[in-house]
Amino acid sequence: MSRPQRQIVYFATAMSLVNLGDSLFYVIVPTYYTHLGLIPFQVGILLSVNRWVRLATNHLAEYGYRRYPSDLWLLGAFFTGAVVSTIYGLATTFFLFLLARIAWGIAYSFLRQAGVMHVVACSAENALTEQMGYFTGINALWRTSGLFLGGLCHDHFGFTMTFVGVGILSLLALPLNRIARKQAAMPDREARAVKESGRNGALVCFGIVMGLVGGGMIISTLGLVLKTRVGESFHLAGFLVGVATLTGFVMAVRHLIDGVGGPVLGALVDRIGWRRSTAGLFLLGSILLLMTGLQENVAGLVVVIMLYFICATALYTALYAQSGQNGPRSVAAFATAIDFGMSVGPLIGWGIAQLKLPLSTIFFTGSAVYAVGAVVAFKSLSRSSLPLSMGPR
């Protein structure tokens, strides 16, 4: 395995800082929404509206970077992310939360587009998936401690102080971004992306599946699921542990898996082949989600979810690396597919809660959707004579 490029390390760290407010929003709000004067369906809207916005702004970001190249796009996006985290802590109405989530959706389109293409610009083609694993992994490792400490701070210092503090901390992303940025032209990849722009059907399908289940239904309702199992708090080794702390711990372990597993899983995907890896991972993920819905105790549920997170990490790393290799337009298309799934996912998950259906229904539904992804992947594997835009290298 090769070492991560220095520019990738700096940029991933900056991304992790400005992403922390959004990550904590998913951890804290599902367990605290009644204190904010929100109802479950409003929570679903807030957890998904930033993704709906990105359906329009992903291609806008790609166009802006390509047509009017300037570092001001990225600086503005980082600054907006810091301001939004502060607004979370100060907002008192659903409307203010909604405006903040919309602003974050716009900013993240520019951050993600720049991040993926930054990795492509800094990586050799035969090590792209591995370097993408480093990018997502470093980002995740920096956020791991932040998520756990954020949940802990919320339980001890309150909602407002936690998010205002995160907003101030996020400003460190500005100097880190300046260190990381490096100009790199990729005319061959952009030309290839234009040539293959009409052959991304399976890529779009996989993006929707990943976004709908992992980033949408599971993550947005994890705090609620854990709360129904343990209540507001529980005792562990003589200590009183709040549900926000438990949720933050689970989310932190998820990012730890991303951090440790990203480069390793990326290297394995390169060795095994993209089609075979994708088919196997979607099938395994479907089985694990089914098992999660059948778990009766919290410990078993957490363990199986961790295994599912490993599958999701491998899929996320491989698919983003391949879309990046195809060029900026493919990145925007794949990102939009993921965002569409992530937009619908929280509405489905919290809609299930609103209808008072068993919360295990969330995992059973996710299992069925992953099974669809597996079918598409196996069909692609059997049609090797009709290669996708992201064939194995």
Residue ranges: model-predicted function:
Residues 57-69, 260-273, 353:
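Helix-to-loop junctions at the C-terminal end of transmembrane segments
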Residues 167-186, 376-381:
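C-terminal membrane-cytosol helix-exit motif in multi-pass small-molecule transporters
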Residues 102-139:
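Cytoplasmic helix-loop-helix junction between adjacent transmembrane helices
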Residues 275-318:
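C-terminal transmembrane helical hairpin of 12-TM major facilitator-type secondary transporters
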Residues 72-86, 167, 276-290:
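Structural signature of the two symmetry-related core transmembrane helices
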Residues 110-123, 313-327:
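Intracellular juxtamembrane helix-capping segments at the cytosolic ends
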Residues 28-41, 220-244:
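Short amphipathic helix-loop junctions that connect adjacent transmembrane helices
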Residues 45-62, 249-264:
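Central cavity-lining transmembrane alpha-helices of secondary-active solute carriers
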